[in-house]
Amino acid sequence: MPAVCESLLDDIEDMVSATDPKPHDRQSARKNIVPRARKRNKNNIQEEEPPADSTIPGTQKIWIRTWGCSHNNSDGEYMAGQLAAYGYSITEQPEKADLWLLNSCTVKSPAEDHFRNSIKKAQEANKKVVVSGCVPQAQPRQDYMKGLSIIGVQQIDRVVEVVEETIKGHSVRLLGQKKDNGKRLGGARLDLPKIRKNPLIEIISINTGCLNACTYCKTKHARGELASYPVEELVDRATQSFQEGVCEIWLTSEDTGAYGRDIGTDLPTLLWKLVEVIPEGAMLRLGMTNPPYILEHLEEMAKILNHPRVYAFLHIPVQSASDSVLMDMKREYCIADFKRVVDFLKERVPGITIATDIICGFPGETDEDFKETLKLVEEYKFPSLFINQFYPRPGTPAAKMEQVLAHVKKRRTKELSQLFHSYDPYDHKIGQKQQVLVTEESFDSQYYVAHNRFYEQVLVPKDPDFMGKMVEVKIFEAGKHFMKGQPVQDSYIYTPSITKPLAKGEVSGLTEELKPPNNIPKSETLLEKHWERLQVFLFLTALLAAVIAFVGTKLV
């Protein structure tokens, strides 16, 4: 049996037909065989290729719209600077922009309405949208912001990341607070690139948040508790600004008077350090401060406001002259405290301008309460008065209080406005000679806008030699909100001891390594940058095509 099996296996392995071709013949025949190539689907090949208009972040045009306070405007300038430094083009024409960056304000309902309408308009125009500011920070779950990218008020240093991801089609939300070892910081760094709306004016936020808990305020929900920047960082920022040709600095925050209480310093200490670096011919303007925190420093504040390079101007919101209303607002002062601050400063700083705010129709305000407010305005005749009809903001205690009827709020707002327009604060200054600092153009483009020692607005003729300079003028006309001045003949036009200002739209804060050469226009520099990117893209595309062709020949 085994022998039979072995014989069978040998026969099977060795079995060859007499008609089979020999191995040599098979090899020769193989050379004449042409393999059939599988037909390619041209449509599929085209679909696999990258689209010709691939989106490359950093090449788009961006339109930025900011609502609200000077703090918010400073944030908008920082975001514009970072985007421009990265390569994006900042445009003032929304219809030409690829992306709209909407920087919102939550103080009053009308401002939020404008913000919401702008989002809708952007979406209808098929624009990419990024939102920032106090509205999304305080209430990010609003239905009209679903699917939108959000930059929190303390995350503006990451605007490039958010815009880049949004352009790619992603939705990004950065709403966190900045902390150092658990301690809250003032916000993004002060030395970030920036595009000043006015190259002559630098807005510096000295702190964010506040120590109060006003029952009507929605901003507190967004900006949070007080967090101050160190004195050294603020002085460095001011110094850098003057080196870039700025001739006027605005100090801003939700409450400048509270500055430093969280880091062991105070506002007068900061101000004395700042005046040391203000060049001759440049000026500093102090922003809004609430009465409680200025009371402790009245003597020092009076000395500082008398300094020749500090405007004799202070914005102190009173909101109401009724103690019962102030208590419901949780303003933490009484009307006597406010009067003490104003009276002291008017006595120690002759001619000082006191600006204030008043809310008409706060919940629970009676006719008697409102009459107290009218008496206060009649007594002090504030030259600058911001009158606001009360709007309940969602999530605030005041929104849950019993509301004053709408027609009553409107009547009180109108009555206070009529009182304000019944007196002329500047008529007595006609004929005076004043030194004014010229910083901008009027809205109607007919005049240059300047401010005198008391930060009162003076319109002067449009002489290019005046811009950014101290000019002596004689007042010949006065209106409700301004005066008009004629330059005094043969008077000396004083040029501040600072460098030439940056061009409009030029990025502040860039190191020399990052700055383009001065003789190359910005648009030219951006074009070269984009052309370099395009060259790299074309090279990689050609290389890929060569590889595909080589592989194809091998397959054949």
From Swiss-Prot:
Residues 196-427 form the Radical SAM core domain. Gene3D superfamilies: Methylthiotransferase, N-terminal domain (3.40.50.12160), tm_1862 like domain (3.80.30.20). Keywords: 4Fe-4S, Endoplasmic reticulum, Iron, Iron-sulfur, Membrane, Metal-binding, S-adenosyl-L-methionine, Transferase, Transmembrane, Transmembrane helix, tRNA processing. Residues 17-57 are annotated as: Disordered. The keyword Acetylation does not apply. Residues 427-489 form the TRAM domain. One of its GO terms (biological process) is tRNA methylthiolation. One of its GO terms (cellular component) is endoplasmic reticulum. It is a single-pass membrane protein. It is found in: Endoplasmic reticulum membrane. GO terms for molecular function: 4 iron, 4 sulfur cluster binding; metal ion binding; N6-threonylcarbomyladenosine methylthiotransferase activity; tRNA (N(6)-L-threonylcarbamoyladenosine(37)-C(2))-methylthiotransferase. [4Fe-4S] cluster 2 binds at residues 210, 214, 217. Pfam families: Radical_SAM, TRAM, UPF0004. Its cofactor is [4Fe-4S] cluster. It catalyses: N(6)-L-threonylcarbamoyladenosine(37) in tRNA + (sulfur carrier)-SH + AH2 + 2 S-adenosyl-L-methionine = 2-methylsulfanyl-N(6)-L-threonylcarbamoyladenosine(37) in tRNA + (sulfur carrier)-H + 5'-deoxyadenosine + L-methionine + A + S-adenosyl-L-homocysteine + 2 H(+). InterPro entries: Elp3/MiaA/NifB-like_rSAM (IPR006638), Methylthiotransferase (IPR005839), Methylthiotransferase_CS (IPR020612), Methylthiotransferase_N (IPR013848), Methylthiotransferase_N_sf (IPR038135), MiaB-like_arc_euk (IPR006466), rSAM (IPR007197), rSAM_horseshoe (IPR023404). Binds 2 [4Fe-4S] clusters. One cluster is coordinated with 3 cysteines and an exchangeable S-adenosyl-L-methionine. Residues 60-168 form the MTTase N-terminal domain. Its EC number is 2.8.4.5. [4Fe-4S] cluster 1 binds at residues 69, 105, 134. Belongs to the methylthiotransferase family. CDKAL1 subfamily. Catalyzes the methylthiolation of N6-threonylcarbamoyladenosine (t(6)A), leading to the formation of 2-methylthio-N6-threonylcarbamoyladenosine (ms(2)t(6)A) at position 37 in tRNAs that read codons beginning with adenine. This is Threonylcarbamoyladenosine tRNA methylthiotransferase. The lineage of its organism: Eukaryota, Metazoa, Chordata, Craniata, Vertebrata.
